[in-house]
């Protein structure tokens, strides 16, 4: 499942951008916090993702990731440029393809290759169009497959990128709050999109969503939006941590699917970015620990 939220000025107390995500996964799945150093690569190098191998970038940034132990990709993370990304499962009318890139692979690839949020949108969309998405999203369960949406942010702006097979739409957020929770939300007001959508002026959510596009007021997405609205103008990292730990909304999930890891980031225009991760289940009782992308 998952819930991902972002707050930008004037919603935040200090003018920063604050990002948060709960990763809801099979309860028995371990998720670890891992750092990967920046690197340069030779022409022709390939990188092995969870299921497929693709051309490596000339250079990759240092990243800190919250990573299910069995996969190459990550549920969420941050890079040395102050870009953060989290993904969400979405179920669409588009067909599922064969094993290809997982959404979690695209989270890691976007962080390793992008120096800004808008660049990460471009990178992930291009990878999606070329390589596609597909494959089992839980270890040992070939039936658990889905498409992906992403919330991507830096200290200036945020983007929601939603996908259905190789089609995609992206919405830019420059003020206020936004949250996503396992459903398509972008209708006709996208800022960028795949060529097929632009050519037919598509309503992305209406065309592709496997569920009704009308927001259920009892859903986690609706709850998350209300909780953000309640704190508008005063949102801090601690506010986001409290939202991630909320039980009434279902955002802090317990059960066969559970919140197995959580992350909050504060992105500042002066470059003083801060990241906190639990590296363990249940933000209602697990402390958030400061995490540097690069060790001092």
Language-model segments: what does each one mean?
Residues 251-296:
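Substrate-recognition/cap regions that form aromatic- and gly/pro-loop-enriched pockets
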Residues 107-114:
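Short, well-ordered beta-strand elements within core beta-sheets of diverse protein domains
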Residues 244:
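Catalytic-pocket segment enriched in acidic/His residues
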Residues 1-103, 123-240, 250, 260:
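A contiguous strand-loop segment
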